[in-house]
Amino acid sequence: MNPNFLDFEQPIADLQAKIEELRLVGNDNSLNIGDEISRLQDKSKTLTESIFGNLTSWQIARMARHPRRPYTLDYIENIFTEFDELHGDRHFSDDAAIVGGIARLDNQPVMVIGHQKGREVREKVRRNFGMPRPEGYRKACRLMEMAERFKMPILTFIDTPGAYPGIDAEERNQSEAIAWNLRVMARLKTPIIATVIGEGGSGGALAIGVCDQLNMLQYSTYAVISPEGCASILWKTAEKAPDAAEAMGITADRLKGLGIVDKVIAEPLGGAHRDPVAAAALIREELSSQLAMLKEFDNDELLARRYDRLMSYGL
Protein backbone atom coordinates (compact mmCIF):
# COMPACT_ATOMS: atom_id res chain seq x y z
CA MET A 1 0.00 0.00 0.00
CA ASN A 2 1.33 3.43 -0.98
CA PRO A 3 1.64 5.47 2.26
CA ASN A 4 0.93 8.69 0.34
CA PHE A 5 -2.59 7.45 -0.42
CA LEU A 6 -5.36 6.58 2.03
CA ASP A 7 -7.12 3.23 1.69
CA PHE A 8 -10.05 4.62 -0.31
CA GLU A 9 -7.52 6.24 -2.69
CA GLN A 10 -5.71 2.98 -3.46
CA PRO A 11 -7.35 2.49 -6.89
CA ILE A 12 -5.87 5.88 -7.82
CA ALA A 13 -2.50 4.83 -6.41
CA ASP A 14 -2.57 1.65 -8.50
CA LEU A 15 -3.20 3.64 -11.68
CA GLN A 16 -0.43 6.10 -10.82
CA ALA A 17 1.94 3.17 -10.29
CA LYS A 18 1.07 1.77 -13.73
CA ILE A 19 1.70 5.16 -15.33
CA GLU A 20 5.13 5.41 -13.68
CA GLU A 21 5.94 1.85 -14.72
CA LEU A 22 5.06 2.61 -18.33
CA ARG A 23 7.20 5.74 -18.26
CA LEU A 24 10.18 3.72 -17.04
CA VAL A 25 9.62 1.05 -19.70
CA GLY A 26 9.38 3.70 -22.39
CA ASN A 27 12.57 5.39 -21.22
CA ASP A 28 14.48 2.11 -21.13
CA ASN A 29 13.35 0.84 -24.53
CA SER A 30 12.82 4.04 -26.50
CA LEU A 31 9.20 2.99 -27.04
CA ASN A 32 6.46 5.45 -27.88
CA ILE A 33 3.81 4.68 -25.30
CA GLY A 34 2.51 8.23 -24.93
CA ASP A 35 -1.01 7.30 -26.06
CA GLU A 36 -1.34 4.60 -23.41
CA ILE A 37 0.02 6.91 -20.71
CA SER A 38 -2.45 9.63 -21.76
CA ARG A 39 -5.30 7.12 -21.62
CA LEU A 40 -4.33 6.03 -18.12
CA GLN A 41 -3.93 9.65 -16.99
CA ASP A 42 -7.45 10.44 -18.22
CA LYS A 43 -8.72 7.34 -16.44
CA SER A 44 -6.92 8.38 -13.24
CA LYS A 45 -8.46 11.86 -13.39
CA THR A 46 -11.95 10.44 -13.95
CA LEU A 47 -11.50 7.96 -11.10
CA THR A 48 -10.23 10.69 -8.77
CA GLU A 49 -13.21 12.92 -9.60
CA SER A 50 -15.55 10.01 -8.92
CA ILE A 51 -14.00 9.10 -5.56
CA PHE A 52 -13.62 12.66 -4.30
CA GLY A 53 -17.09 13.62 -5.47
CA ASN A 54 -18.60 11.15 -3.01
CA LEU A 55 -16.46 11.32 0.12
CA THR A 56 -18.11 10.53 3.44
CA SER A 57 -17.62 12.74 6.49
CA TRP A 58 -15.23 10.16 7.94
CA GLN A 59 -13.17 10.07 4.75
CA ILE A 60 -12.94 13.87 4.81
CA ALA A 61 -11.80 13.68 8.45
CA ARG A 62 -9.02 11.36 7.36
CA MET A 63 -8.12 13.68 4.48
CA ALA A 64 -7.80 16.53 6.99
CA ARG A 65 -5.15 14.44 8.77
CA HIS A 66 -3.32 13.27 5.64
CA PRO A 67 0.41 12.95 6.43
CA ARG A 68 1.39 14.87 3.28
CA ARG A 69 -1.15 17.66 3.72
CA PRO A 70 0.39 21.16 3.68
CA TYR A 71 0.88 22.74 7.09
CA THR A 72 1.00 26.39 8.18
CA LEU A 73 4.67 26.90 7.31
CA ASP A 74 4.07 25.45 3.83
CA TYR A 75 1.34 28.01 3.21
CA ILE A 76 3.41 30.83 4.68
CA GLU A 77 6.18 30.01 2.22
CA ASN A 78 3.82 30.02 -0.76
CA ILE A 79 1.43 32.85 0.15
CA PHE A 80 3.45 35.51 1.95
CA THR A 81 6.74 37.33 1.50
CA GLU A 82 9.31 38.57 4.03
CA PHE A 83 8.07 36.30 6.83
CA ASP A 84 9.90 37.00 10.08
CA GLU A 85 9.05 34.46 12.79
CA LEU A 86 8.61 35.71 16.35
CA HIS A 87 9.13 33.50 19.40
CA GLY A 88 8.09 33.14 23.01
CA ASP A 89 5.17 34.10 25.23
CA ARG A 90 7.25 36.30 27.62
CA HIS A 91 5.93 34.20 30.52
CA PHE A 92 7.28 30.65 30.28
CA SER A 93 8.74 29.46 26.97
CA ASP A 94 8.38 29.20 23.21
CA ASP A 95 5.87 26.58 22.06
CA ALA A 96 6.79 25.15 18.65
CA ALA A 97 3.22 23.90 18.11
CA ILE A 98 2.28 27.52 17.35
CA VAL A 99 4.21 29.51 14.76
CA GLY A 100 3.73 33.18 14.08
CA GLY A 101 5.33 36.31 12.81
CA ILE A 102 5.14 39.35 10.59
CA ALA A 103 4.89 38.94 6.82
CA ARG A 104 3.59 40.72 3.76
CA LEU A 105 0.53 39.91 1.69
CA ASP A 106 0.23 41.98 -1.47
CA ASN A 107 2.96 44.17 0.04
CA GLN A 108 0.82 44.88 3.12
CA PRO A 109 2.23 43.97 6.57
CA VAL A 110 0.17 41.26 8.28
CA MET A 111 0.52 39.08 11.37
CA VAL A 112 0.38 35.37 10.51
CA ILE A 113 -0.25 32.77 13.23
CA GLY A 114 -0.96 29.06 12.94
CA HIS A 115 -0.64 25.56 14.32
CA GLN A 116 2.28 23.47 13.09
CA LYS A 117 2.25 19.66 13.36
CA GLY A 118 5.61 18.63 11.93
CA ARG A 119 6.54 16.05 9.29
CA GLU A 120 9.20 13.66 10.55
CA VAL A 121 9.22 11.94 13.95
CA ARG A 122 11.62 14.35 15.67
CA GLU A 123 9.79 17.40 14.37
CA LYS A 124 6.42 15.92 15.34
CA VAL A 125 7.70 15.46 18.89
CA ARG A 126 9.24 18.95 18.98
CA ARG A 127 5.96 20.48 17.82
CA ASN A 128 3.91 18.14 20.03
CA PHE A 129 1.94 16.91 17.01
CA GLY A 130 0.36 20.35 16.63
CA MET A 131 -1.18 20.35 20.12
CA PRO A 132 -0.26 23.65 21.81
CA ARG A 133 0.41 24.12 25.50
CA PRO A 134 -0.66 27.34 27.29
CA GLU A 135 2.56 29.09 26.29
CA GLY A 136 1.65 28.55 22.64
CA TYR A 137 -1.66 30.33 23.03
CA ARG A 138 -0.06 33.07 25.11
CA LYS A 139 2.50 33.55 22.37
CA ALA A 140 -0.33 33.83 19.84
CA CYS A 141 -2.09 36.36 22.09
CA ARG A 142 1.08 38.44 22.41
CA LEU A 143 1.47 38.54 18.63
CA MET A 144 -2.18 39.45 18.09
CA GLU A 145 -1.95 42.34 20.54
CA MET A 146 1.20 43.47 18.76
CA ALA A 147 -0.70 43.36 15.47
CA GLU A 148 -3.43 45.58 16.91
CA ARG A 149 -0.86 48.03 18.24
CA PHE A 150 0.77 48.39 14.82
CA LYS A 151 -2.55 48.24 12.92
CA MET A 152 -1.75 44.98 11.12
CA PRO A 153 -4.49 42.53 10.05
CA ILE A 154 -4.28 39.07 11.65
CA LEU A 155 -4.41 35.90 9.53
CA THR A 156 -4.59 32.58 11.37
CA PHE A 157 -4.25 29.02 10.08
CA ILE A 158 -6.00 26.34 12.13
CA ASP A 159 -4.75 22.74 12.07
CA THR A 160 -4.75 20.92 15.41
CA PRO A 161 -6.26 17.79 16.97
CA GLY A 162 -6.83 20.00 20.01
CA ALA A 163 -5.05 21.74 22.86
CA TYR A 164 -2.56 19.51 24.68
CA PRO A 165 -4.33 17.78 27.63
CA GLY A 166 -1.19 16.85 29.59
CA ILE A 167 -0.60 17.50 33.28
CA ASP A 168 2.05 20.15 32.62
CA ALA A 169 -0.38 22.07 30.39
CA GLU A 170 -3.07 21.95 33.06
CA GLU A 171 -0.59 23.10 35.70
CA ARG A 172 0.05 26.21 33.60
CA ASN A 173 -3.72 26.78 33.19
CA GLN A 174 -4.57 25.61 29.68
CA SER A 175 -8.24 26.56 29.95
CA GLU A 176 -7.42 30.09 31.11
CA ALA A 177 -5.01 30.59 28.20
CA ILE A 178 -7.68 29.54 25.70
CA ALA A 179 -10.42 31.60 27.37
CA TRP A 180 -8.17 34.67 27.50
CA ASN A 181 -7.50 34.39 23.77
CA LEU A 182 -11.22 34.23 23.04
CA ARG A 183 -11.74 37.39 25.09
CA VAL A 184 -8.85 39.25 23.50
CA MET A 185 -9.70 38.27 19.92
CA ALA A 186 -13.32 39.34 20.34
CA ARG A 187 -12.10 42.87 21.17
CA LEU A 188 -9.12 43.37 18.86
CA LYS A 189 -9.46 46.50 16.75
CA THR A 190 -7.98 45.00 13.61
CA PRO A 191 -9.34 42.63 10.93
CA ILE A 192 -9.01 38.91 11.71
CA ILE A 193 -9.34 36.15 9.11
CA ALA A 194 -9.12 32.50 10.21
CA THR A 195 -8.67 29.59 7.81
CA VAL A 196 -9.04 25.93 8.80
CA ILE A 197 -6.46 24.07 6.69
CA GLY A 198 -6.70 20.61 8.28
CA GLU A 199 -8.12 19.59 11.64
CA GLY A 200 -10.05 22.17 13.62
CA GLY A 201 -10.07 20.47 16.98
CA SER A 202 -12.15 21.92 19.81
CA GLY A 203 -10.84 24.72 22.06
CA GLY A 204 -7.38 24.25 20.62
CA ALA A 205 -8.74 25.56 17.33
CA LEU A 206 -11.05 28.19 18.82
CA ALA A 207 -8.13 29.82 20.66
CA ILE A 208 -6.95 31.31 17.36
CA GLY A 209 -10.33 31.11 15.62
CA VAL A 210 -12.39 34.11 16.78
CA CYS A 211 -12.53 36.20 13.63
CA ASP A 212 -14.35 38.45 11.20
CA GLN A 213 -14.17 35.91 8.40
CA LEU A 214 -13.88 32.12 8.76
CA ASN A 215 -12.70 29.97 5.87
CA MET A 216 -12.38 26.20 5.61
CA LEU A 217 -10.51 24.25 3.00
CA GLN A 218 -12.71 21.78 1.15
CA TYR A 219 -11.31 18.71 2.93
CA SER A 220 -10.82 20.17 6.40
CA THR A 221 -12.91 19.59 9.54
CA TYR A 222 -14.05 21.69 12.50
CA ALA A 223 -15.56 20.09 15.61
CA VAL A 224 -15.79 20.14 19.41
CA ILE A 225 -14.31 16.63 19.62
CA SER A 226 -12.77 14.08 17.27
CA PRO A 227 -15.07 11.47 15.71
CA GLU A 228 -13.20 8.77 17.65
CA GLY A 229 -13.68 10.66 20.91
CA CYS A 230 -17.37 11.17 20.26
CA ALA A 231 -17.83 7.50 19.35
CA SER A 232 -16.01 6.39 22.49
CA ILE A 233 -18.38 8.46 24.63
CA LEU A 234 -21.65 7.56 22.87
CA TRP A 235 -21.00 3.97 21.80
CA LYS A 236 -18.05 3.02 24.02
CA THR A 237 -15.97 2.14 20.96
CA ALA A 238 -13.90 4.19 18.51
CA GLU A 239 -15.00 1.84 15.73
CA LYS A 240 -18.17 3.93 15.44
CA ALA A 241 -16.11 6.97 14.39
CA PRO A 242 -17.60 7.01 10.84
CA ASP A 243 -21.11 7.24 12.31
CA ALA A 244 -20.01 9.94 14.73
CA ALA A 245 -18.38 11.98 11.96
CA GLU A 246 -21.60 11.95 9.98
CA ALA A 247 -23.78 12.85 12.96
CA MET A 248 -21.50 15.68 14.15
CA GLY A 249 -21.53 17.67 10.91
CA ILE A 250 -17.78 18.35 10.91
CA THR A 251 -17.23 19.07 7.22
CA ALA A 252 -16.85 22.44 5.52
CA ASP A 253 -20.05 22.14 3.48
CA ARG A 254 -22.16 21.17 6.49
CA LEU A 255 -20.78 24.03 8.57
CA LYS A 256 -21.26 26.48 5.72
CA GLY A 257 -24.91 25.43 5.62
CA LEU A 258 -25.20 26.16 9.35
CA GLY A 259 -23.80 29.66 8.88
CA ILE A 260 -20.68 29.01 10.95
CA VAL A 261 -18.27 29.11 8.01
CA ASP A 262 -18.21 32.05 5.62
CA LYS A 263 -16.28 30.50 2.74
CA VAL A 264 -15.34 27.00 1.62
CA ILE A 265 -12.09 27.22 -0.35
CA ALA A 266 -11.78 24.60 -3.08
CA GLU A 267 -8.75 22.30 -3.12
CA PRO A 268 -6.89 20.89 -6.13
CA LEU A 269 -8.27 17.58 -7.39
CA GLY A 270 -7.31 14.89 -4.90
CA GLY A 271 -6.62 17.30 -2.05
CA ALA A 272 -4.21 20.11 -1.19
CA HIS A 273 -1.29 17.70 -0.80
CA ARG A 274 -1.48 16.80 -4.49
CA ASP A 275 -0.61 20.39 -5.47
CA PRO A 276 0.38 22.55 -2.47
CA VAL A 277 1.36 25.52 -4.64
CA ALA A 278 -2.04 25.58 -6.35
CA ALA A 279 -3.78 25.17 -2.99
CA ALA A 280 -1.81 28.12 -1.60
CA ALA A 281 -2.76 30.24 -4.62
CA LEU A 282 -6.45 29.58 -3.97
CA ILE A 283 -6.08 30.58 -0.32
CA ARG A 284 -4.06 33.67 -1.20
CA GLU A 285 -6.72 34.85 -3.64
CA GLU A 286 -9.43 34.51 -1.00
CA LEU A 287 -7.38 36.18 1.74
CA SER A 288 -6.59 39.16 -0.49
CA SER A 289 -10.25 39.59 -1.42
CA GLN A 290 -11.52 39.28 2.15
CA LEU A 291 -8.86 41.60 3.53
CA ALA A 292 -9.82 44.29 1.02
CA MET A 293 -13.47 43.90 2.06
CA LEU A 294 -12.75 44.10 5.81
CA LYS A 295 -10.59 47.20 5.42
CA GLU A 296 -13.73 49.09 4.38
CA PHE A 297 -15.02 48.94 7.98
CA ASP A 298 -13.88 51.31 10.71
CA ASN A 299 -13.04 49.85 14.14
CA ASP A 300 -16.52 50.30 15.61
CA GLU A 301 -18.17 48.69 12.60
CA LEU A 302 -15.64 45.86 12.64
CA LEU A 303 -16.27 45.05 16.31
CA ALA A 304 -20.05 45.31 15.94
CA ARG A 305 -19.95 43.02 12.93
CA ARG A 306 -17.76 40.52 14.81
CA TYR A 307 -20.08 40.57 17.83
CA ASP A 308 -23.17 40.00 15.69
CA ARG A 309 -21.41 37.16 13.92
CA LEU A 310 -20.57 35.40 17.19
CA MET A 311 -24.05 35.94 18.63
CA SER A 312 -25.69 34.47 15.52
CA TYR A 313 -24.31 30.99 16.17
CA GLY A 314 -27.03 28.51 17.02
CA LEU A 315 -29.92 30.74 15.98
Swiss-Prot record:
Subcellular location per the Swiss-Prot or TrEMBL entry: Cytoplasm
Keyword Lipid metabolism: yes
Record-listed E.C. numbers: 2.1.3.15
Pathway listed: Lipid metabolism; malonyl-CoA biosynthesis; malonyl-CoA from acetyl-CoA: step 1/1
InterPro entries: Acetyl_CoA_COase_a_su, ClpP/crotonase-like_dom_sf, COA_CT_C
Residues of the CoA carboxyltransferase C-terminal domain: 40-293
GO terms for biological process, alphabetical: fatty acid biosynthetic process; malonyl-CoA biosynthetic process
Keyword annotations: ATP-binding, Cytoplasm, Fatty acid biosynthesis, Fatty acid metabolism, Lipid biosynthesis, Lipid metabolism, Nucleotide-binding, Transferase
SUPFAM superfamilies: ClpP/crotonase (SSF52096)
Pfam family, one: ACCA
Enzyme class: transferase
Location, primary (coarse class): cytoplasm
Cellular component GO terms held in the UniProt record: acetyl-CoA carboxylase complex
GO molecular function, one term: acetyl-CoA carboxylase activity
Catalytic activity: N(6)-carboxybiotinyl-L-lysyl-[protein] + acetyl-CoA = N(6)-biotinyl-L-lysyl-[protein] + malonyl-CoA
Gene3D superfamilies in alphabetical order: 2-enoyl-CoA Hydratase, Chain A, domain 1 (3.90.226.10)
Presence of keyword Lipid metabolism: yes
Family from the record: Belongs to the AccA family.
NCBIfam families: accA, AccA_sub, PRK05724.1
Record note on quaternary structure: Acetyl-CoA carboxylase is a heterohexamer composed of biotin carboxyl carrier protein (AccB), biotin carboxylase (AccC) and two subunits each of ACCase subunit alpha (AccA) and ACCase subunit beta (AccD).
Biological function: Component of the acetyl coenzyme A carboxylase (ACC) complex. First, biotin carboxylase catalyzes the carboxylation of biotin on its carrier protein (BCCP) and then the CO(2) group is transferred by the carboxyltransferase to acetyl-CoA to form malonyl-CoA.
Full protein name: Acetyl-coenzyme A carboxylase carboxyl transferase subunit alpha
